[in-house]
Amino acid sequence: MTLKTADVEYIAHLARLAIDSEAIPHYKHDLSRILEFVGQMNKVDTTNIEPMAHPLDAIQRLRPDEVTESDQWRTFQSIAPQVEAGVYLIPKVID
């Protein structure tokens, strides 16, 4: 599919991009090649192909769900500059 100059300008407008008029032929060429490639991919017969969640057929190696650290809430509360009712107080940032 070959794009026209007006197509590139419209795409740039939709994307809120400012493109120099001198660069439009370059973008026209590149975008046309991308669309041709997408067209080639659309022609591939995927009738008996099972959809995949991930392109790599790998299994995630997850660690066992075990507690690895103890609760240090009291320790962190004791060293905080200001605490009230169990929450950390910070200086006012916005008026």
Curated annotation (Swiss-Prot):
| Pfam families, sorted | GatC
Q: Does the keyword GTP-binding apply?
A: no
Broad enzyme group = ligase
Q: What is this protein called?
A: Aspartyl/glutamyl-tRNA(Asn/Gln) amidotransferase subunit C
Q: Which family does it belong to?
A: Belongs to the GatC family.
Show the catalytic activity.
L-glutamyl-tRNA(Gln) + L-glutamine + ATP + H2O = L-glutaminyl-tRNA(Gln) + L-glutamate + ADP + phosphate + H(+); L-aspartyl-tRNA(Asn) + L-glutamine + ATP + H2O = L-asparaginyl-tRNA(Asn) + L-glutamate + ADP + phosphate + 2 H(+)
- Keyword Isomerase among UniProt keywords: no
Instruction: Output the InterPro entries linked to this UniProt entry.
Output: Asp/Glu-ADT_sf_sub_c, GatC
Q: What subunit structure does UniProt give?
A: Heterotrimer of A, B and C subunits.
Function per UniProt: Allows the formation of correctly charged Asn-tRNA(Asn) or Gln-tRNA(Gln) through the transamidation of misacylated Asp-tRNA(Asn) or Glu-tRNA(Gln) in organisms which lack either or both of asparaginyl-tRNA or glutaminyl-tRNA synthetases. The reaction takes place in the presence of glutamine and ATP through an activated phospho-Asp-tRNA(Asn) or phospho-Glu-tRNA(Gln).
Its domain of life reads Bacteria
The Gene Ontology biological process annotation of the record reads: glutaminyl-tRNAGln biosynthesis via transamidation; regulation of translational fidelity; translation
